[in-house]
C-alpha cells in the first residue's frame, strides 16, 4: 500500500500474471473472428447509402444508443437494461484503468480518483448490474411475458453476468479483509463482504479464497467475452451500428410504385436481394418481441409474428454464410434438403431434380408460432451448399377452404 495517498496494490496475492495474457490471446482471437463473420456476411448485401448527414446520425446515436430512449419506453425493462448496460460500461472503464496502471505505469489509481471512482462508483454500478440481472430474471422467469423468446442462451447470459459481478465483489471483499485496507470503507459492498468474512475465515483462508476466485473470475469473464459475438449479446455492437445507419428519409418516402402488370417478381426471393443494411437489421434483433407486440394482426389474435420472421431470416443468413464458407457442394446436402435448382419458377419439379420436401431450420421449430388452420405456415427451405441463391422463407398455404392470409 502506498502511504502517500489512497490506492491499492494491483494483482495483490496473484502470481503468474503472464498466464492471464496467454489466455487473453485466444479470447480476443475468438471474439474478433465472431465479429468478423458478422461483418463479412453484411458485405454480401447490396449497396445502401446510409452514411450521409453524419451530424443527424450522431444525434440518433446519442438519443437511442447512449440515452436508450426507445428501450425506456417500457419502464421496467428500460430500467434494468440501463442498470446492466451502464454498469458494464463503468466496470469496463475500471478494468481498463487497472490495466493501464499495471502495464503502462500511468498511476491513475491514486488519490481522489481512486476513492470516488475506482472504489465507490465502481462498487455502486456493480451493485446496479446485480439489481438489473435480478429484475430481468424476475420478468423472464416469474412474469413470463408472451412476447419474449425463452432459450437456454438467454438464461446463460444472465447467469454469466450474475457470476462475473458476484465474483468481483467477493475478490474485492476478501482482499479488503485480508489486508485490512484503510480505504476499504469507500467500497461499501466489498467492505460488507469483508466484515462478514473476517469472523469466519482466517487470513490464510482469505488468501486462498481470493486467489482461487480471482482466477475463476478471469476465466468466466474471458469466456463471456469470447462467446459474446455468437449470441444475441452481439447487439452491443450491432444496435449502435443499426441506429447510426438508420433510414433518415420520411416514413413511406422510400416506397416505390409497383406496376403489377409488368413486374415479374415482388420483394426479394433470395438473400442476394437484401442490402447490407437489411442483413445488419437481422443481426441487430435482440428477440425482445416489441415488433410482435405492436403488430396489428397479432393484436387481434392472429398468430403472426414479425419477430419470428426476422429470426427465421437471421438463422437462414447465418446458415447460408457458414455453408458457403466451407465451399461444400450439392452432393454434401443433408438427406431430404431441398435444392432450389431442382424447381422451376412454378415450383414444379424439373428434369433431373429430386422431389424433395421443404424442411425447417432446427432452431425455427422452437420459435415458429402455431398458425391457425386457415393461416399460411412459414417454412424454411435450406439453400444449396455453396450456392449463391439460397431460398428464403416461403409462405406455404395450409389446406383449408380458403387460402387467403387472415387480415386484421
Model feature map: region roles:
Residues 1-269, 274-276, 311:
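Membrane-embedded alpha-helical bundles of multi-pass integral membrane proteins
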Residues 39-43, 219-220, 288-292, 388-392:
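Short acidic (Asp/Glu) and glycine-rich catalytic loops that position anionic groups and cofactors
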Residues 113, 117, 320-322, 360:
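Small-residue-biased low-complexity repeat regions
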Residues 255-282, 290-292, 298-322, 333-358, ...:
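Ferredoxin-type iron-sulfur electron-transfer modules in oxidoreductases and energy-metabolism complexes
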Residues 325-327:
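Acidic, glycine-centered low-complexity repeats within long intrinsically disordered regions
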Amino acid at each position: 500500500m502506498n502511504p502517500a495517498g489512497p490506492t491499492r496494490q494491483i494483482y495483490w496475492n496473484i502470481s503468474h500474471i503472464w498466464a492471464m495474457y496467454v489466455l487473453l490471446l485466444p479470447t480476443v482471437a475468438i471474439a474478433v473472428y465472431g465479429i468478423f463473420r458478422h461483418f463479412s456476411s453484411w458485405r454480401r448485401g447490396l449497396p445502401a447509402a446510409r452514411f450521409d448527414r453524419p451530424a443527424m446520425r450522431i444525434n440518433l446515436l446519442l438519443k437511442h444508443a447512449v440515452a436508450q430512449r426507445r428501450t425506456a419506453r417500457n419502464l421496467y425493462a428500460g430500467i434494468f437494461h440501463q442498470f446492466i448496460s451502464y454498469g458494464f460500461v463503468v466496470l469496463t472503464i475500471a478494468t481498463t484503468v487497472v490495466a493501464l496502471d499495471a502495464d503502462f505505469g500511468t498511476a491513475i489509481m491514486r488519490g481522489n480518483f481512486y476513492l470516488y471512482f475506482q472504489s465507490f462508483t465502481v462498487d455502486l454500478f456493480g451493485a446496479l448490474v446485480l439489481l438489473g440481472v435480478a429484475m430481468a430474471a424476475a420478468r423472464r422467469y416469474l412474469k413470463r411475458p408472451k412476447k419474449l423468446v425463452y432459450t437456454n442462451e438467454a438464461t446463460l447470459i444472465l447467469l454469466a453476468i450474475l457470476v462475473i459481478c458476484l465474483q468481483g465483489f467477493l475478490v474485492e471483499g476478501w482482499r479488503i479483509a485480508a489486508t485490512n485496507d484503510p480505504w476499504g470503507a469507500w467500497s461499501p459492498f466489498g467492505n460488507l463482504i469483508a466484515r462478514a468474512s473476517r469472523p469466519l475465515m482466517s487470513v490464510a483462508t482469505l488468501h486462498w479464497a481470493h486467489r482461487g476466485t480471482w482466477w475463476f473470475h478471469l476465466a468466466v469473464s474471458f469466456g463471456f467475452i469470447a462467446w459474446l459475438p455468437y449470441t444475441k449479446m452481439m447487439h452491443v455492437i450491432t444496435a449502435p451500428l443499426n441506429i447510426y445507419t438508420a433510414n433518415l428519409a420520411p416514413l413511406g418516402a422510400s416506397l416505390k410504385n409497383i406496376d403489377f402488370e409488368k413486374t415479374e417478381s415482388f420483394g426479394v426471393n433470395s438473400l442476394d436481394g437484401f442490402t447490407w443494411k437489411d442483413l445488419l437489421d437481422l443481426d441487430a434483433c435482440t428477440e425482445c418481441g416489441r415488433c410482435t407486440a405492436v403488430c396489428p394482426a397479432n393484436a387481434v389474435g392472429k398468430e403472426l409474428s414479425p419477430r419470428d420472421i426476422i429470426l427465421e431470416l437471421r438463422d437462414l443468413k447465418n446458415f447460408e454464410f457458414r455453408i458457403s464458407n466451407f465451399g461444400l457442394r450439392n452432393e454434401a446436402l443433408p438427406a431430404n434438403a431441398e435444392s432450389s435448382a431442382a424447381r422451376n419458377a412454378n415450383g414444379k419439379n424439373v428434369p433431373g431434380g429430386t422431389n424433395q420436401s421443404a424442411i425447417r431450420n432446427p432452431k425455427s421449430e422452437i420459435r415458429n408460432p402455431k398458425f391457425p388452420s386457415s393461416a399460411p405456415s412459414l417454412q424454411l427451405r435450406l439453400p444449396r451448399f455453396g450456392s449463391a441463391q439460397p431460398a428464403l422463407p416461403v409462405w406455404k398455404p395450409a389446406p383449408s377452404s380458403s387460402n387467403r392470409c387472415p387480415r386484421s
